Amino acid sequence: MIKAPKPKDSKLWRDSYYHKLFGFKAAIETERVLKFFEKERPNDKRPRNAIIAIKEWAEGKRTLGMNEVRKLSLDAHAAARDAKSEGARYAAHAAGQAVGTWHVPTHALGAFGYAGRAIIAGKR
C-alpha cells in the first residue's frame, strides 16, 4: 500500500477547489434522496439545514466552523434516529455525512453511500 503524505495543517487544503467540489457533490446527491425523509417528517428541517449549509459553503456564500458543522451533522444523524423508514433514515444520515465534508472531505463518500441505500430502500 502506498502511503500518501498527509498535510499536518488543514489550512493547506481547506476551502480548496476540490474540497468545495466534494462538498457540493455530496449536497447535490443528498438533495436527491431527501424526499424520503421529508415525506415522512415534513416539519423536521435538521437534514435540510445540513445540506443548505454545505452547499452554501461550497458555493462561497457562507463560512462554516467546526462547532457549527458538528451541530449540523449530529442534528441530521439524530433526525435519522427519529425516522421510521429505512429510506428516511438513510437520507438523513446522508445529510449528516454531507455537511461533515467540510471537516473531512472523504465524508462525501459516506454521503454517497447513504444516498444509494436511501434509493434502494425507497424502492421497497
What spans do the regions from the language model cover?
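Structured binding/interaction patches within domain cores
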Residues: 2-124
